[in-house]
Amino acid sequence: MYVTRTLSQFRKYQKTLSEESPEGPFSGVLVITDEEAETEDTFCFGMCTRTKIEKLPLPQDKILSVVHLDSSGNRETSVKKVLFIPALDQPLSSNRYYVVHARGRYKGKVSVCSREIEKGVCCFPDILHDKKPKPLDPRNIYQTVKINRHHDRTFFGKSVAPDGTPPSFLKKKGWELRTSRSLHPRRPREALGLDDELRARLPAFGFPVSTIRSGSVIVGEWYCPFMFVKENCSLSYQMRKSMFYRITLSQYWERIYHCENNDAHNNIDENNDDNEEEVVSVEANVVREANYVKGMEAVKGEKEGHGGFHWYRQVQGPRGPGERRRKRGVSSPVGLSFVVVERMRRVMEEGGWVGGGRKVVRVERDEPIRISRRDWRRFGCYVLVESFGLRRADGVLLVKCVFRHTNRLRCNWE
């Protein structure tokens, strides 16, 4: 999960490049081009825009071209269109990136560094061939490349792994970087991560007992590059459909129990012992964690396959006698990388949610009836709910992960 920061901010304050991600493990920072940075990149009184990139960090809201020139510097010998995504858990000053192919047969896949041990044998023992790009696996250090400046205005790539060698188009020194195209209008917007102060404030509680669910408040916002999400389509098509997914964390109150007092005008018993406290007994079964795919209940699978994905699959209802399982109306499963799932869980645990244990918890408590509430008519008990929502660039809600804090209850009287 990534927060976003503006390019102009890093140009003004170079020291901020060395700052660790404020979000903790399994997180990173995306650099987006703002109006101020775009103005700086113009000349001829704003009539023309510079396409050549000469400094780091690299923006993530644009497809970039890695351009190799001939010895004269006038003719292009090769051009690769790529997307540079900062490596997780690294400051931007490390200049470590996942290099994603944005065009051709490997579109959507990430460059892989070759290993010295993989040098050819037989006739050409000293030749190290480029490895084919593969889907991203954040655990694979050979898919991380460090970009270095060369002679101020050009670049070259180097493997982070000691025995690794990047693909030739990155390894060769002196290539230029040019802006190919912007991702507008589906480029990442401002996403500042978790707002701890707003989260601790909790949603307003001034609503009637008839309210089943209060209005929600967004307390966190991130972006997730498409390599960490799997849909039922090719990487090439997925990259074209949604290069970045928006993740939000919302808070709201949800009613788990309510009752009415039918004897509101006759509830004071003159013969009642003053030492005996009247209470409302709350009894409710609460599902602590629930998942949804496109609005339908889903189950989360275990980590599996290349990249360590958890698959969220819609729950299909039970079949009747002799009835075939219906496929109609069931959406395709959605996969989330383990880094996204673990980051969400850490955010929850930092907010007081306790993982593990039973999925369904029995809530039982006695709520005392104060003297000022002796004429109450309706009572409701609410649990604090925090919900992660993952949306495509077109706004479609793909996955929703709901966490109920059974230790954060509030009661409402009327």
Regions found by a protein language model. Give the residues of each.
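Lectin-like carbohydrate-binding module/patch detector with strong preference for beta-trefoil
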Residues: 2-227
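Membrane-permeabilization and membrane-interfacing ectodomains
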Residues: 208-414
